[in-house]
Amino acid sequence: MKEINSLECQWESIDDNNDTTILGDDIYFDYIISQLDIHQNWSPDIRLIRYFRKFNKESFDKISDTEYINPSFFQQRDKRFYPLNDDFYHISTGGYGIVFKMDKYVVKFVYEPNKQYSPIDTTAEYTIPKFLYNNLKGDEKKLIVCAWAMGLNYKLTFLHRLYKRVLYMLLLIIQTIDNQRLNIHHFSHKYFLKSFNEKKSDIKFVKLLSYFYPIVVQSNINVINYFTHMFHFFEHEKRANYLYDRGNIIIFPLARFSSDKVTEQMAIELGFKSIVQYVKFIFLQISLLYIKIYELPCCDNFLHVDLKPDNILIFNSDCPITIKFKKYTYVFNEPIKACLNDFDFSQVANILNKKIKNSLKIEHNWYYDFHFFIHTLLRTYPEIESDKEFSDSLEDFIMCCTKNTCEKFRLKVSILHPISFLENLITKNIFSNWINGESC
């Protein structure tokens, strides 16, 4: 595939609704696809109910007392969790994707039910970071997460079928434990969520999952972790009539964690003096990335639209990162780097993103992103207030907020501050640890 370094990116159109296309390295993509059984089917629901009628609370107790426990069925936040093999482990589900970890890969499935978009209209998550990476000339390009491959217009019905199979299994297990009548089609969502959340960390319940998941689900896709997120996604009333038919599969490198997961203790272990110094590090790297993007010809319209700590991923950094800006040289000797991720709603230069047209009704620039970013930083890390100079500098981005100008941290009005506003901030003494190679 031709490198995406031109403002006039051209793509072959997909005329047939069933045609598929792979962007990027098809070796990565073919490997991931080879690990998925996208044609898997299960026996009818009535047979599943008949199977569970053979069990009762006493037989469940016997299984819990005697059977093997698979630690990968604990929740990932549980210290007892351990991935035993290279299965696909569910790590998140949001409004715009279902994400799994598999070995050194992150695999994201995105349903595209909106018929007004062609498959090519949904490629921003691959094309925009690739375009930026190919055009940025310095180490700032290392602060972008680029997908290794993206498959367009693939049939994803298997994932919804898998979710339903696991949901029904969990329902039948819970109903048996609670001495309830077995029923998978008429049940209380509130009852299921409450009961599952109460039981999911119990070792006896995890033993039941260890026993039944291989028998009932028979899949290398483990969705037990954060299953409630998947439940809320698929059962949401606004998706009641979705077909869950086709969408995209995106393959990324695996990060250590998202930036919002770092605690005070973790920050110190990473070599920072405090959590506030870590936040300064994150803020400075992302600010420099934006500034360097805005230096590119025709790129002064760049918008990410969802700039927040959990969309900034932390990767290992094997060598110092050096970024030059005017008379300043910023040097980062830290063992990590902060990389911008999730470009699904982004726009830059002449690479059109139809989704952003429906998302934003008025003109915005970088300030829209940073206004939202500062709000989310202050909410995630209230410790910032302990550093008055840093806190005051960030407050400048949100000091004029009212109900008429800002809703849920997002600007409702067009405020087109020049990028020099951000440039002046990063030259302040609060970032002296990294200016002109002074970091150690």
Curated annotation (Swiss-Prot):
Q: Which residues of the sequence carry a binding annotation for ATP?
A: I91, S92, T93, G94, G95, Y96, G97, I98, V99, K115
PTM text: Phosphorylated in vivo. Autophosphorylated in vitro.
Q: Where in the cell is it found?
A: Host endoplasmic reticulum; Host endoplasmic reticulum-Golgi intermediate compartment
Its catalytic activity?
L-seryl-[protein] + ATP = O-phospho-L-seryl-[protein] + ADP + H(+); L-threonyl-[protein] + ATP = O-phospho-L-threonyl-[protein] + ADP + H(+)
Protein origin, superkingdom: Viruses
| Stored InterPro entries | Poxvirus_ser/thr_kinase, Ser/Thr_kinase_AS
Q: Which GO terms describe its cellular component?
A: host cell endoplasmic reticulum; host cell endoplasmic reticulum-Golgi intermediate compartment
Query: Is Phosphoprotein tagged as a keyword?
Result: yes
Family annotation (Pfam families) = Pox_ser-thr_kin (PF05445)
Q: Per the database record, which ranges form the Protein kinase domain?
A: 85-440
Enzymatic class: transferase
UniProt-recorded Gene Ontology molecular function terms: ATP binding; protein serine kinase activity; protein serine/threonine kinase activity
Provide the E.C. number(s) assigned to this enzyme: 2.7.11.1
**What's in the keyword line of the UniProt record?**
ATP-binding, Host endoplasmic reticulum, Kinase, Late protein, Nucleotide-binding, Phosphoprotein, Serine/threonine-protein kinase, Transferase
* Enzyme active site: D306
Q: Which family does it belong to?
A: Belongs to the protein kinase superfamily. Ser/Thr protein kinase family. Poxviruses subfamily.
Summarize the protein's role: Essential serine-protein kinase involved in the early stage of virion morphogenesis.
Protein name (database record): Serine/threonine-protein kinase 2
**Origin organism lineage:** Viruses, Varidnaviria, Bamfordvirae, Nucleocytoviricota, Pokkesviricetes
